[in-house]
């Protein structure tokens, strides 16, 4: 960015958490002016992630006030810098969690930008200034912006920028994206419901593993799973022993892993994507028997993110969402505390957010 552009800024407004009350309220602030490699977009939709709610409650110990949340950002380009090559005014675009990295370290080179030690997040999580996407405009380097497919809905597509890549990437990375592969999904929440949709789009045979017997009908009728296991039903679990090529575990709290290992075929893979905040207990013997593998995955590169929205547009994969107005955000956060949403809140910024 030139010194002249750096000296300028543009007025913006959003919703901010200004103190430890846990309540968001209107907030006027400044974003950087559009630099020569930047794209400015009018934000139309922004997904509400459980991460945003954890930041609201300072569960990571890293929340800085004022905190403007939002990293599932979809909108329309309104301005481009003089050296921008990938976008033009009027393009539909998306911005996810990472908006800059060093671009030189080994992590960046292998597509693990989310793990770059100099990563900059859209909402300021990584000890760097930043205001998230729950605002009227956003400015980002073009290299961290994706082109939004014309036939992909912007509201129900917004969560693909976070939870979508969270489940899509490990399916691809661990070879669970082939027709006929048997994939287990643990948990039918925000991540789990999209994991089912992507696995089915790949042609996999999907087993939902849940602690809630009451989710069986929904799993079959709404999401078209091929089988359903109640994790506490020892007889069902035993009957399904060594039937799965891989399992995506989406549950965000610590739970027993041994029953899941037993479901895996020899050389099967258990991939943790639920981000529990306490350590698991794992028996090495359970893995050694059959050469089973445990791994973890979170997020993906900008290239991965572009790939996922293109795939989703081609295969009609979107999240099940509840679209809400801006003034409903505090209520939505309270409902997230109770897991009371099917399956993702998305804020209609474009139609319901007016300058305070």
UniProtKB/Swiss-Prot annotation:
Co-factor binding comment: Binds 2 Zn(2+) ions per subunit.
InterPro entries named in the record: ADH-like_C, ADH-like_N, ADH_Zn_CS, CAD-like, GroES-like_sf, NAD(P)-bd_dom_sf, PKS_ER
Name of the protein in its database record: 16-methoxy-2,3-dihydro-3-hydroxytabersonine synthase
Function as written in the Swiss-Prot or TrEMBL entry: Converts the unstable imine alcohols produced by CYP71D1V2/T3O into 3-hydroxy-16-methoxy-2,3-dihydrotabersonine or 3-hydroxy-2,3-dihydrotabersonine.
EC number: 1.1.99.41
Tissue-level expression: Expressed in leaf epidermis.
Gene3D superfamilies xrefs: Medium-chain alcohol dehydrogenases, catalytic domain, NAD(P)-binding Rossmann-like Domain
Keywords: Alkaloid metabolism, Metal-binding, NAD, Nucleotide-binding, Oxidoreductase, Zinc
Residues binding NAD(+): 187-192
EC class of the enzyme, as a word: oxidoreductase
Residues that, per the record, bind Zn(2+) 1: 49, 71, 162
Entry's family note: Belongs to the zinc-containing alcohol dehydrogenase family.
Residues that, per the record, bind Zn(2+) 2: 102, 105, 108, 116
Pathway(s): Alkaloid biosynthesis; vindoline biosynthesis
PANTHER family: ALDEHYDE REDUCTASE
GO MF, any single term: zinc ion binding
Induction: Up-regulated by herbivory.
One Gene Ontology term from the biological process aspect of the record: alkaloid metabolic process
Origin species: Catharanthus roseus (Madagascar periwinkle)
Catalytic reaction(s) noted: (3R)-3-hydroxy-16-methoxy-2,3-dihydrotabersonine + A = (3R)-1,2-didehydro-3-hydroxy-16-methoxy-2,3-dihydrotabersonine + AH2; (3R)-3-hydroxy-2,3-dihydrotabersonine + A = (3R)-1,2-didehydro-3-hydroxy-2,3-dihydrotabersonine + AH2
């Amino acid at each position: 960015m030139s010194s002249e552009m750096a000296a300028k800024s543009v007025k913006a407004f959003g919703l901010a958490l200004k103190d430890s009350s846990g309540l968001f309220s209107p907030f006027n602030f400044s974003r950087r002016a559009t630099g020569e490699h930047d794209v400015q977009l009018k934000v139309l939709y922004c997904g509400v992630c459980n991460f945003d709610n954890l930041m609201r409650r300072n569960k990571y110990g890293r929340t800085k006030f004022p905190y403007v949340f939002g990293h599932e950002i979809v909108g329309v380009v309104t301005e481009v810098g003089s050296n921008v090559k990938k976008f033009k005014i009027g393009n539909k675009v998306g911005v996810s969690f990472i908006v800059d990295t060093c671009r030189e370290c080994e992590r960046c080179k292998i597509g693990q930008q989310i793990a770059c030690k100099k990563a900059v997040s859209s909402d300021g999580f990584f000890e760097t200034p930043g205001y998230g996407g729950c605002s009227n405009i956003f400015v980002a380097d073009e290299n961290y912006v994706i082109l939004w497919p014309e036939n992909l809905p912007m509201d129900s597509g917004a969560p693909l920028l976070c939870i979508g890549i969270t489940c899509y990437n490990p399916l691809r990375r661990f070879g669970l994206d082939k027709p006929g592969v048997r994939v287990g999904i643990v948990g039918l929440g925000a991540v789990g419901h999209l994991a089912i949709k992507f696995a089915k789009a790949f042609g996999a045979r999907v087993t939902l593993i849940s602690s809630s017997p009451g989710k069986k009908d929904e799993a079959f009728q709404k999401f078209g799973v091929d089988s359903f296991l109640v994790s506490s039903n020892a007889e069902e679990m035993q009957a399904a022993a060594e039937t799965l090529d891989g399992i995506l575990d989406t549950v965000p709290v610590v739970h027993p892993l041994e029953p899941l290992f037993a479901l895996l075929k020899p050389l099967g893979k258990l991939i943790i994507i639920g981000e529990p905040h306490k350590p698991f207990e794992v028996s090495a013997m359970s893995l050694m028997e059959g050469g089973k593998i445990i791994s973890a995955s979170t997020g993906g590169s900008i290239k991965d993110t572009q790939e996922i929205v293109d795939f989703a547009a081609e295969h009609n994969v979107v999240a099940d969402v509840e679209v809400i107005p801006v003034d409903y955000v505090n209520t939505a956060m309270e409902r997230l505390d109770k897991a009371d949403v099917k399956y993702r809140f998305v804020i209609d910024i474009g139609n319901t957010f007016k300058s305070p």
